[in-house]
Amino acid sequence: FRTMRVTAEKEQKKLLSRNEASGPVFKIRNDPRHTGIGKFLAHTGLDEIPQLYNVLRGDMTLFGPRPLPVAEAAKLKSWQKKRHDIKPGIISPAILTGTYHEDFDAWMKSDIAYVKEKSLGYDVRLAVRALSFLTGLMERAVANP
């Protein structure tokens, strides 16, 4: 399913001045390109459900660095590319700690730390944190649609 309008990529060029992210990525809170239902799905995290298919296929894991669009990944510095040493994941430590929306270098460092420290114990801790995080997202999305 689609959470953004078909013209989202073209519209991004017009929205570059509103980019809230540092580094080579494009992020806008309350992105105007979302469809009505897409906004709800994105705010609750339900837009990630189709990614479970990629996990079942073996292309992704539940936990790990979030994949970047190809054009953005091509702009990474060499040290930042270490995040690609493992398969991408649906749930990133950077999302759970908030560095995903802060500083790009902090986000990359969080991803690389996960690559270096990856273990079953780390994934269990992330799973517990993710459940708490998703519960909070759902509550906020229902309270503020």
Please annotate each region the language model reported.
Residues 1-145:
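Conserved small/aromatic sequence motifs within transmembrane helices
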